[in-house]
Amino acid sequence: MKKINMKGMRKLSITATAMVAAAVMALAGCGSSSSSSSSSSGSDSTSGAKTTKFVLGGLWPETGSLAYLAPPELAAEKLAVKDINDAGGVLGNKITTVDADTSDADHADQNTSAAQSVLSKNPSFIIGPASSSVVKNTYKSITSQNIPMLSMGATSAGFSGLSDYFFRTVAPDTVQGAVMGNLIAQDGVQKLAIAVFNDEYGTGLRDTIVKTASAAGVDIIYGEKDTFDPTETNFSSIATAIKASNPDATLVIAFDQTKPLLKALASAGVNTKKLYFVDGNTSDYSSELDAGLLEGSKGTIPGINPSDDFVKRLESTGVDLKNTTTYGAETYDGIILAALAAQKGGSADGKTIQANMAAVSGSTKGEKCDSYKACVALLKDGKEIQYKGQTSIGAFNDAHDPSSASIGVYKYDADNKPVFDHSQEGSVPKA
């Protein structure tokens, strides 16, 4: 899951609904599949045949536990399409879109039916899903057809080099985990307890944090191997066990389980001013918890905060962002990169886009440009480019991860809202 960037980056307050945010990185499930499209027929060609028609496929969590993530992603899609088409489109044609609702990973049938709905329109490229678990349920059906896909939020470390046709604009959990582990150690924590749900995202991130923190001298006194079921609703026994372990601080890795878990920790007498959260739950709890309960606690979220100007542009699309911009920048940049790849390669087919994604991201160390319009102008002059958009990620490496990315560190205020403190850039390990 990624990141929970909020409107007003310098006094960021992430909404409670965004609490399940990095669910984006791992959940996927309920609801019935649906799709909508501004292109009823899609591209006339297969993923390998040359074409000038760019059909953008989108897989979004419009229903289910991740539904709060859809608005900023859909707004970013609308904005990117507008910017591309206003600049002349791709290869002289306006791009069209076909979208489908994947819901979340609890209902794999909808994940796959949404993917098939989009694939039936012969897309040139697919943006999404954001969740690692939903990606796991869908990527083979997409990449096997030589259609490139890009996830804006799937942070699973195991996805590095997943497929020649899989890309992402967010760093793998190895980066966030290392930053969090070092943050815990730098804060002087000597005894750490961990509450983590039994989920690929949760345990993978936990293991990286444990490795980094332990190497820095932190003793993991609870939760190094323990997990709880994602469907758990009663956390009293876990909270009691954590209290009994007498930790200096507690790391919580969960999605929508976080609220009841926090209440249980508080009831058990655990120090809630010394908690650490990750992108799945670094959220606004101002309306859920007593004022000051989390003051001083910290969280990490992959990526940078979007600029105020970019947030305003997202709002200008008419989509109600629900006070969150989670994965908006990653979605926008992913679409722009794909359009530039088609423009550079001279065709909007999947193979051409895949072959040029790394180059337009900067792997050939071309001239820097920060907008689709500016980059296209350079391409038309025969120049190599390096698109530097909203996320400021490094060029795609051989595993199709960004070669470098930022992790934001947030600190909770007296209203139980996470406020952006600083960002730390990290290099992405090679697969």
Please describe what each predicted stretch is.
Residues 2-431:
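Extracytosolic ligand-binding ectodomains
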